[in-house]
């Protein structure tokens, strides 16, 4: 009996952990993912070499709620909106458009 109860609790716990939970939709604005990759960082960049390597990048001082707001914020700073990965070696940052 104890083995059955323990096994049942273990199975139900595993199911609860494995089931995805969808975020609730409500009237407030939800933040859109600015970059497609989870390892990218949304940054405003100034100098671009071949459209890929950026030297002067900063993170936005605000948190834009969508890509249009992100582009507008960076444009107001005189920079381009980019999704960047910091390389392990070197000074440059590898970036792509959002």
From Swiss-Prot:
<keyword id="KW-1015">Disulfide bond</keyword>
<feature type="disulfide bond">
    <location>
        <begin position="45"/>
        <end position="57"/>
    </location>
</feature>
<dbReference type="InterPro" id="IPR010636">
    <property type="entry name" value="Cerato-ulmin_hydrophobin"/>
</dbReference>
<feature type="disulfide bond">
    <location>
        <begin position="44"/>
        <end position="74"/>
    </location>
</feature>
<feature type="glycosylation site" description="N-linked (GlcNAc...) asparagine">
    <location>
        <position position="26"/>
    </location>
</feature>
<keyword id="KW-0964">Secreted</keyword>
<keyword id="KW-0134">Cell wall</keyword>
<dbReference type="InterPro" id="IPR036686">
    <property type="entry name" value="Hydrophobin_sf"/>
</dbReference>
<feature type="glycosylation site" description="N-linked (GlcNAc...) asparagine">
    <location>
        <position position="54"/>
    </location>
</feature>
<protein>
    <recommendedName>
        <fullName>Class II hydrophobin 3</fullName>
    </recommendedName>
</protein>
<feature type="signal peptide">
    <location>
        <begin position="1"/>
        <end position="18"/>
    </location>
</feature>
<comment type="similarity">
    <text>Belongs to the cerato-ulmin hydrophobin family.</text>
</comment>
<keyword id="KW-0325">Glycoprotein</keyword>
<comment type="function">
    <text>Aerial growth, conidiation, and dispersal of filamentous fungi in the environment rely upon a capability of their secreting small amphipathic proteins called hydrophobins (HPBs) with low sequence identity. Class I can self-assemble into an outermost layer of rodlet bundles on aerial cell surfaces, conferring cellular hydrophobicity that supports fungal growth, development and dispersal; whereas Class II form highly ordered films at water-air interfaces through intermolecular interactions but contribute nothing to the rodlet structure.</text>
</comment>
<dbReference type="GO" id="GO:0005576">
    <property type="term" value="C:extracellular region"/>
</dbReference>
<dbReference type="Pfam" id="PF06766">
    <property type="entry name" value="Hydrophobin_2"/>
</dbReference>
<feature type="disulfide bond">
    <location>
        <begin position="84"/>
        <end position="95"/>
    </location>
</feature>
<feature type="disulfide bond">
    <location>
        <begin position="35"/>
        <end position="83"/>
    </location>
</feature>
<keyword id="KW-0732">Signal</keyword>
């Amino acid at each position: 009996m104890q083995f059955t109860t323990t096994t049942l609790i273990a199975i139900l716990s595993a199911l609860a952990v494995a089931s995805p939970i969808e975020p609730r939709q409500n009237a407030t604005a939800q933040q859109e993912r600015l970059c497609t990759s989870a390892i990218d960082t949304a940054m405003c960049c100034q100098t671009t070499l071949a459209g890929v390597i950026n030297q002067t990048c900063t993170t936005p001082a605000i948190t834009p709620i969508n890509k249009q707001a992100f582009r507008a914020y960076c444009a107001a700073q005189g920079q381009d909106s980019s999704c960047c990965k910091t390389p392990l070696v070197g000074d440059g940052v590898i970036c792509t458009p959002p």
